[in-house]
Each structure stands twice: as structure tokens, then as C-alpha cells.
Amino acid sequence: MDRDNKVLFSIISKCLILIKKRYGRDINLDTIPTDDEAVYKLIMTDTGSDVFALEHAKYAKPKDEICSTEIRHIEAMHAIVHRSMHEKYCQYVENKHDPKNIEYRSDIEECVLAETYGVLLYVEQLVEIINSYSGISKEVSARIAKYIRKGMQPELSVWKSVFVVGTQQNGYTQEQAQQIWEWLKIEGELTTYRDIAASAAFTTYQCYWLKTYYPNEYKDALVPNVNNDESWSGM
């Protein structure tokens, strides 16, 4: 767990204790809806830096342009910023606002990449595409994905021929298979694990949910060493 998430978890814990103390309510954040329009409105308009995972300036523009109505948008934002994917950010925003212009090379890519508007963001997507095109097992596809992300050229040279042959057996020409391989090497290098992005996204959403519905308690939870003292409430 990185520093930002540790800080956020501490804030969330303090906030929940304050809510329990003041209102007698036990809030289970694991069960809150993740499609709350009021929460997304705050995410889009909030200019504060107290949600620490979003305090860095590089999050400001992606937050405004990506995080609109679904938790997957927040996941994408964290993935893009975490790996500094500027070109993918531009492509994601453009495709998100005009999905009719997305062009998929195959049904395989449309099936895997539709939820990220045709942009390869996650290791899990990379593994799925390798497996679906070539028939290489998921386990080995995951190993190839690792080689791609780490730029391990000797290992990739060994697996290129296996991928190309397998893809040809699934109905693609040698030229098409080689083009797909090169595309995977380029686009797959900056992918991130979805579970990491999902965890960061849900933590971010939880903070904004608390900030939306319990703003005083959330504010008080930000105060260092507050110890849940009512004198800090500002109520």
C-alpha cells in the first residue's frame, strides 16, 4: 500500500468513528452504490487537495475529463496517471467523448477494450488479448505480458514466433500477426494491474462519498491528532 492510500485509509477510519459517535450510524463503505451522481459531481468540481490520492497537480485535468459517472472511469484515471501515459490519456479522453470514432482491429480487441474505449490500460487486458489471438495459455500469456512490460527483448524474441504461428492458426495472416505483436509490445509496456487501479479508485470514491454526505466529519478527520474530539467538529 502506498503512502497516499495509507493516509486515505486513516482519514476514512477517523471519519467513520466520528459518524458513529455523533449519529450512532455504522457505515459499511463496501456496500455503498458506486453510481451516485452527487458523488461524481463533487469529484468533477472539487478543487481541494484533501483527497490525497488526487492532490498531485497531474491528477487535476484527468479528474475533470475522465471521472464522470462510473467507477471504471476513476480506475482508468489512476491507471493513466500511475504509469504517466500521456498519449493514452489523450486517446482515452477523445474516444470517451466520441466512441463512434473508435476503430477496432478485430472482435477480440473490441471485446477486451470496449470498456476502456479502445485503449489498452491494464495487464489483464494484455493477457486476454495475447491468449485470444494466439491460443497461448493464460499462464504463459501472463508471463509474456511481464516480458512486454519489462522490455525483456531476449525473452520476447523467443515468444514472438510462437505468438505469430498461433495467431495464424486462428485465421490471421503472418503480416497481420506480426503487426499485432508489435502493437502489443508498444501498447502493453505501460499497462498497469487493474486490481491496483481498482483499489485506488474505490478508496478515492469512498472518500468523496464521505465528503459528499458527511462533510463536517470528513473535514474533522483531516485534522492531525484529532482523536475524535467533538471540539473539532465545526458544527
Residue ranges and their predicted role:
Residues 1-235:
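Noncatalytic, beta-rich nucleic-acid-contacting surfaces in large DNA/RNA-processing enzymes
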